[in-house]
Amino acid sequence: MRAESQGLVFGPVRSGRLGASLGLDLLGAKICTFDCLYCEAGATRALTAARRPYVPAARLLGELAAWLFEPHPPFEVVTLGGMGEPTLNTDMGQIIEGVRELCPGTPVAVLTNSSLMADPDVRRDLCLADMVLPSMDSLMPSEFLQVNRPLPGASLMDIRRGLLTFRRQFAGKLFLEVLLLAGMNDSSENLARLEAFTAELAPDRVDVTTMSRPGAYPQALPASPATLARFREALCGEARPLAAGPEKSAQFAPPLDNEGSRRLEALGMRVLDSLARRPQTASSLASALGAGEADLANLLDDLSARGLVKAVTLGGETFFSRVGR
Ligand code: SF4
């Protein structure tokens, strides 16, 4: 049983916000309108607002069809995201419609940094989804620039207006995410602005999170539990499950047989591919790849010794990432 593809289809991963989520990468590379300090996919290589079919619908849907054809773990939602901002892909609407045909009855979610919400074409395509998870980390212009590092000329005002317009157009579920960094966007001024904004936006849910994996830049540090509690109390209303912990992959796949060196080598390639997407702990990697933890530990030691992987500690946990990602 295959638990993770090496291409544009990845997971399923156990997401605190969505459940067992099968991911689709609409960019195929780190292409984004932002270069967030905390980005777990590494620094943005192509900072752009140019919308293009970066991954054409036919290619992505073909990969998904092939993935579905083989035995695979169950999943609860298909999530459009990837290594950058998925709304940059002009084929997004076609992709959502194609996923509906291939996975009837499974909800489709889209992750977005909200930067293109002012574009009516983007809003029209997003309206095809069942769930949209936009992020808004700060309504203070200085904090927005510092944390999200947008393209020059990006307008917080346009993003704010675009989100409010989208809320009126969209019949699905809107889950707003606010990610806090220590000393960066955890100010009282930001909290007051976010409080007023969420009252106006009326999302179905607000998720206040912080980094749970090493980010793209070393100055990004997780917000404290007290800060998270303060923001959650003001923005989230009633108590709800938090999404700040490391994601855990769905544990449906049996352990691989790692006896043969060829299989081990193949597993090594999958580990490198997975770590190129985001840093992960040994146990989350083992779970995602359906591999035994002892095998993974040995493999990670070997890859570290060869300079292909590096270990970083965050919040008492050791994360591995691909060198040069
Ligand atoms: S966190 Fe999201 S919005 Fe920020 S740089 Fe990474 S992919 Fe882009």
Please report, for each region that a protein language model flagged, where it lies by residue:
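Conserved AdoMet/S-adenosylmethionine-binding subsite of the radical SAM
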Residues: L88-T227
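Conserved alpha-helical substructure of the radical SAM core
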Residues: A43-T79, Q94
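Short strand->helix junction
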Residues: A29, A46, E85-P86, G183-M184
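Canonical Radical SAM [4Fe-4S] cluster-binding loop centered on the CxxxCxxC motif
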Residues: L18-A58
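Glycine-rich beta-strand-to-loop/alpha-helix junction loops that act as flexible
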Residues: T79-E85, N113
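Auxiliary Fe-S-binding modules of radical SAM enzymes
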Residues: M1-R17, G62, P71, S188-R325
